[in-house]
Amino acid sequence: MIQYPEPLAKLIESYTKLPGIGQKTATRLAFYTLSMQEDDVTNFAKSLLSAKRDLHNCSICGNITEDDPCPICRDKTRDHSQILVVEQSQDVMAMERMHEYHGLYHVLHGVISPVAGTGPEDINITSLLKRLKKDDEVKEIIIATNASSDGELTAGYLAKLIKPAGIKVTRLAHGLSVGADIDYADEMTLFKAVQGRTEM
């Protein structure tokens, strides 16, 4: 087995902690980092630290933001009667690229997953329920969890919790292929999924 110098081995190990990055890709990234100009490496490191230090979750919707509440929650021109529930912050970015949805969001930061041992208490559901109790302006919850088994399980669980409150609960149309992540979908697919949403 190749013995890399300790600083290089630690850099490779750090890259392997990123999702989807295996040993081979991590090694390639580490060697590329070593070939970069020192100023570029410094700026890269500063960007990582700045993002970790300055970004946090919005206290209302859970989306990543610098300010609290986030710009979307503060925007009075948006439709406050609709909340679109997504798994991750990158799903919000995907929906915003579409420029067709003008309501609010709620980020779960995960899904209910029996296999992974993730229960309802492990994701951002309680804050959604509290939000709905405080805000009688909300008329529709659009559930936009991914079209995976865990996404469907989470959608069903949310619908059972929310519908008794008299709030309309809808699900994105199945234009998204099974197992597909929302943040990988193109704008037209997302537009059709929102427009064709069905009541649960």
Curated annotation (Swiss-Prot):
GO molecular function terms listed in the Swiss-Prot or TrEMBL record: DNA binding; zinc ion binding
Domain of life (superkingdom): Bacteria
Coiled-coil stretches noted in the UniProt entry, renumbered to this chain: none
CDD domains: TOPRIM_recR (cd01025)
InterPro entries listed in its UniProt record: DNA_Rcmb_RecR, Rcmb_RecR, Rcmb_RecR_Znf, TOPRIM_dom, TOPRIM_RecR
Domain Toprim: 81-177
Short name of one Pfam family: RecR_HhH
Biological process terms in GO annotation: DNA recombination; DNA repair
Record-annotated membrane-spanning stretches: none
Disulfide bonds, paired cysteine numbers: none
Key words, A-Z: DNA damage, DNA recombination, DNA repair, Metal-binding, Zinc, Zinc-finger
Zinc finger (C4-type): 58-73
HAMAP family in alphabetical order: RecR
Job of this protein: May play a role in DNA repair. It seems to be involved in an RecBC-independent recombinational process of DNA repair. It may act with RecF and RecO.
NCBIfam families: recR
Family the UniProt entry places it in: Belongs to the RecR family.
The protein's name in its UniProt record: Recombination protein RecR
